Amino acid sequence: LLNFWATWCAPCVQEVPSLVQLQSQMGSKVTVFAVSMDQDEAAYRAFTLKRMAGLLTVRDPDHKSSAMYGTFAYPESFLIDKDGKIQRKFVGPVEWTSPEMIDYFNKL
């Protein structure tokens, strides 16, 4: 699950706990890769150390990766399969640990 986010994005911050919980709950079945659009490296580091334990995360202050996916509003997530194909796009915050989403991931 490729997630584009930023510390200055309130909906992104709201979504983070469910991303962390999804990774914890699904284990190796799902890998959450969170790409921050933050320009401020200190804010990014402080936030990720405090709130994003267990997630793979990088900072892309030039927005190159999100531009490759056509993403200009955050949060936005892409479910990418093992072959690198985008299976689904999610625009806006998602409650990743809702019963519907857990069922969706379990059926993959």
Residue ranges and their predicted role:
Residues L1, P11, V58:
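Conserved SAM-binding loop
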Residues L1-L2, V32:
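Hydrophobic beta-strand anchors of alpha/beta hydrolase catalytic cores
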Residues F4-Q21:
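Conserved redox-active cysteine motifs that mediate thiol-disulfide chemistry
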Residues A6-A10, D38-A42, H63-S65, V94:
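Solvent-exposed loop/turn segments at secondary-structure junctions
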Residues Q14, Q21, A42-K50:
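Short alpha-helix adjacent to the SAM-binding motif of class I
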Residues V20-S24, N106:
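A structural alpha-helix within SAM-dependent methyltransferase catalytic domains
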Residues K29-A42, A53-H63:
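Thiol-based oxidoreductase modules, predominantly thioredoxin-like and allied folds used
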Residues A46-G54, D60-K107:
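Thiol/disulfide oxidoreductase modules built on the thioredoxin-like
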